[in-house]
Each structure stands twice: as structure tokens, then as C-alpha cells.
UniProtKB/Swiss-Prot annotation:
GO terms for biological process: L-histidine biosynthetic process. Homodimer. Keywords: Amino-acid biosynthesis, Aminotransferase, Histidine biosynthesis, Pyridoxal phosphate, Transferase. Belongs to the class-II pyridoxal-phosphate-dependent aminotransferase family. Histidinol-phosphate aminotransferase subfamily. InterPro entries: Aminotrans_II_pyridoxalP_BS, Aminotransferase_I/II_large, HisP_aminotrans, PyrdxlP-dep_Trfase, PyrdxlP-dep_Trfase_major, PyrdxlP-dep_Trfase_small. Coiled coil: none annotated. One of its GO terms (molecular function) is pyridoxal phosphate binding. It comes from the Bacteria. This is Histidinol-phosphate aminotransferase 2. Pathway: Amino-acid biosynthesis; L-histidine biosynthesis; L-histidine from 5-phospho-alpha-D-ribose 1-diphosphate: step 7/9. The modification N6-(pyridoxal phosphate)lysine is found at residue 216. Its cofactor is pyridoxal 5'-phosphate. It is an enzyme of class 2 (transferase).
Length: 357
């Protein structure tokens, strides 16, 4: 038995790590598998202070994001992507081997992975689906019943991997009836959504946390910058377990520039283009055997097919990557397709038509 096998924490023996799009798939010239933006925008970086450690929390960055979100800067915590925010919440609120979090599958995989990494239990309350498009919604009654034994409740809206937004009345019902649980609403895709954010509810609900990111609509997945929005006492607690230098200085510089007025105007234009492209792709794929699983409020589409693995392999062999979601509860033979540039989408449409011809 190796030294690692002897000394590792026992629960990690059974842990399956999160299979990110970049980790699980490689190669390809067209990447439509990670819900990234096709835009690569230009920024400037001052390298004169790269010999110095960055701030624990950048006041200019947190202030800029607070203004963007319409809240006070004291309610903002910047982190290495929203994934770090997920981990911080579990570390700060959950006792290993004792507490649980609640998730609503099919949903983003990092909620469960982060919990299991720290020996925290995971309670699943699946989304309700009547079989109709865009009808995946919260089972509020079951969530409220289970919340008594769960420290943290993770809700993803708009949903990844489904794409649709959760009913805000249902989210508020969970908040109202789960006052002893932290209710986390992951709004990674909110810039694409026609629905309302719940950020304005922070004043009303001391147990509400909202996760945000610059990885999607802001087209900055490569700088790893996310935000956790919550009331001051939650922010103060999370700062106790946050790494001393969470964001590199170049990340902070770029993020601040991305939140300036001119950059936000560019973001709105790019989002509008991507939404138009999404609708164009959806219309084109109506001519194929693919079945839309859920109406999208994001920059991706979710489709059922006869053989997801075969379809993904065929496209991969032709240097085009999409994501197989078959491992998710209720999504057997389902693929997720990120909306790319017009040229990338044209290639996608053509390859899918060729595959099904």
C-alpha cells in the first residue's frame, strides 16, 4: 500500500472529481462544449506591480461590481470564479461528517463535488418535469421539507445544464420557509436571461446568497473571476476562510476594465448577438431529429437524441466539440450545445445535418 493510500482521507477514496469540459475533452478547432463566449476582447495590463502580492479584496473591483449589481460594496466578495464561492460556503457553514447540502438535479456538478470533498452529505430533490419543454421547476414542497436537515440549498437559475430560469415565486417560497438554511441562487448566466435577478432580495432575506461570474457573458473565463453577493455578516464569515490572495493582480485589472461603461455596452451588444444566434441555431435544428429538452434562457441549447455518445464522437472526429450530458439525472442521451460565433454555428448546423442525413 502506497503512502498516499495509507494517509489519504478515507472518504476521498470514493470521490469522482468534477469532469470539466476542458478536462474531459481535448482537441478540436470549434469549442461548443463549455458555455464559453466566442468573443476575445482586448484589455491592458500594467505589469509594474507584478512583484507585489495583490490585495485580499480589491476595493475598486468590489465597488465596480457592486455598482453593476445595484448593491452596496460591503455585500460583495470577489473570488476565483464562482466555484470558489461554492467551496467557501460549504467550508464556512457545514460540519464534515455531520451536515448536508441540498441540490436539485439535473444541476451544476460542483455543488455536490465540493460538498463531498469536505465530507458533507448531499440531499437530492430533483426538479419536476412534466415532459413539456421548459417545464423543469423546483419541487418546493419537498425542498422545504428537506431543508430542516440541510445547511445550504443550491439553486441554479438560469439552470446549467437545462438552460431555463427557475420560477422566482418558487425561489422566494424556499427562502421564506427555510430561514435556518443558506439559500444560494447561482446566477452565472443571468446576463442572458429575460427573467429577473434575485439580487434585490438581499435586503429582505438574510439567508440569501447570489453567485455571479465573469466567465460567461463577460467572455472572461480565462481570468477566473467570480463574485459572491450576500449580507455583510455572511461576507465577514467567508473572509475568515478565504485564501489571503484570491485574485491575481492582472485578473483584478482586467475585471475592473470589463465593468466600465464602455465594456458593459459592448457586453450588451455581444449578448444580443449571441441570443439572436441561439434562436437561429434552434430554428435550423428543428429540421433535424434532435428534440429540444428545455427552452433556453442562456447561451446554450439542450437536445435529446438517440445516441448522444455517437453524436458527440462524430462531431469530435470532425474537430467540433459539444457536451454529452447523459450522466445527469433525467438526461439520458442528451447533449448540450454552446452558441458560438456565426461561422462556428454554421459549421455546427452543417455537421448535424450531415450526421442525420
Amino acid at each position: 500500500m502506497s503512502i498516499v493510500e495509507q494517509l489519504q482521507r478515507q472518504h476521498l477514496k470514493q470521490l469522482t472529481p468534477y469532469a470539466s469540459a476542458r478536462r474531459s475533452m481535448s482537441g478540436g478547432n470549434i469549442w461548443l462544449n463549455a458555455n464559453e463566449s466566442p468573443y476575445s476582447n482586448s484589455y491592458t495590463v500594467d505589469d509594474s506591480k507584478l512583484n507585489r502580492y495583490p490585495e485580499f479584496q480589491s476595493k475598486p473591483l468590489n465597488q465596480a461590481y457592486a455598482e453593476y449589481a445595484g448593491i452596496n460594496a460591503s455585500k460583495v466578495l470577489s473570488s476565483r470564479g464562482s466555484d470558489e464561492g461554492i467551496e467557501l460556503l460549504i467550508r464556512a457553514f457545514c460540519e464534515p461528517g455531520q451536515d448536508k447540502v441540498l441540490i436539485c438535479p439535473p444541476t451544476y456538478g460542483m455543488y455536490a463535488i465540493s460538498a463531498k470533498t469536505f465530507a458533507v452529505g448531499v440531499t437530492e430533490v430533483p426538479l419536476l418535469n412534466s415532459g413539456e419543454v421548459n417545464n423543469w421547476q423546483l419541487d418546493t414542497e419537498s425542498i422545504i421539507e428537506a431543508a430542516a436537515e440541510c445547511k445550504v440549498i443550491f439553486l441554479c437559475s438560469p439552470s446549467n445544464p437545462l438552460g431555463n430560469a427557475l420560477n422566482t415565486d418558487d425561489i422566494e417560497q424556499v427562502l421564506q420557509h427555510s430561514p435556518r438554511s443558506i439559500v444560494v441562487v447561482d446566477e452565472a448566466y443571468i446576463e442572458f436571461s429575460s427573467g429577473d435577478s434575485v439580487v434585490s432580495w438581499l435586503e429582505r432575506y438574510p439567508n440569501l446568497v447570489v453567485l455571479r461570474t465573469l466567465s460567461k457573458a463577460f467572455a472572461l473565463a480565462g481570468i477566473r473571476c467570480g463574485f459572491l453577493l450576500a449580507n455583510d455578516d455572511i461576507i465577514e464569515l467567508l473572509q475568515k476562510v478565504l485564501a489571503p490572495y484570491p485574485l491575481p493582480d492582472p485578473t483584478v485589472q482586467i475585471a475592473v476594465q470589463a465593468l466600465q461603461t464602455s465594456s458593459l455596452e459592448r457586453l450588451q451588444q455581444q449578448v444580443a448577438t449571441l441570443l439572436a444566434e441561439r434562436d437561429r441555431v434552434q430554428t435550423a435544428l428543428e429540421q433535424t431529429p434532435l428534440t429540444l429538452v428545455s427552452e433556453s434562457d442562456t447561451n446554450f441549447l439542450l437536445y435529446q437524441c438517440e445516441d448522444a455518445a455517437g453524436l458527440v464522437k462524430s462531431l469530435t472526429d470532425n474537430d467540433l466539440l459539444i457536451r454529452n450530458q447523459s450522466a445527469q439525472r433525467g438526461l439520458e442521451n442528451v447533449v448540450r450545445i454552446t452558441i458560438g460565433s456565426a461561422a462556428e454555428n454554421d459549421e455546427l448546423i452543417q455537421q448535424l445535418k450531415d450526421y442525420f442525413s
